[in-house]
């Protein structure tokens, strides 16, 4: 009987400690804000003869964080929400982490034969991923508007130097959607600077998901970078959507519309 009471006491103490640990976790939330209609950047897994495209925007974690979900807002160009077949999220660290620096020119520019610079770009390879195709991500789609315009777009015009400065592919319109995702399992990230890459596959060859931009600045956070993009032909390098592709006299810069939630 004494041994049983001791075991029960240990078990109860374990539950109390577990509850205390759970209760001590602080909620985490990060958001770049609502779309501004300036830019739509394609971002999709490889499928049906389409090259993979990755559009990436950054966020900073000041402590170990347990990411449980995310939301991102985009435009369905020549497609509808019923045609969405796959959603994926990739997390990258900032170059030169997870990257082969020897293939670049080195400091301070870190250029390659394909791109002007890798400074402040995402790394060569992803740090972690979640994908509805393998069951590690669940998603829901909400239509926010049926005729949302974006003043410029980047879809197919992602080229290595010297042809990178296409100025973009012009205005587009389509359904504005918000994609809410749950990570299963959650993504555990140590304190660091990261890039968030949302990707959406639409059925068929014509449609594309375009990630919508948000204002930058004055709403940028300290250390904020800008949207970078690449396709499978440019991999492992990246281009800046503003500055490299839309290289106006005063180059624009863009953030992507997304939010993250979890605990830390």
Model regions: which residues?
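Extended extracellular/luminal ectodomain segments enriched in beta-structured repeat modules
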Residues: 62-71, 82-84, 191-192
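Bacterial N-terminal signal peptides
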Residues: 9-19
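Boundary/junction segments of secreted and surface-exposed precursor proteins
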Residues: 23-48, 103-107, 263-264
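Non-catalytic, beta-strand-enriched accessory regions in extracellular/secretory proteins
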Residues: 46-60, 255
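Aromatic- and Gly/Pro-enriched, solvent-exposed loop/edge beta-strand patches characteristic
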Residues: 52, 76, 82-223
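Bacterial N-terminal signal peptides that target proteins for export
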Residues: 1-11
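Short, surface-exposed beta-strand/loop patches at domain edges
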Residues: 188-193, 197-264
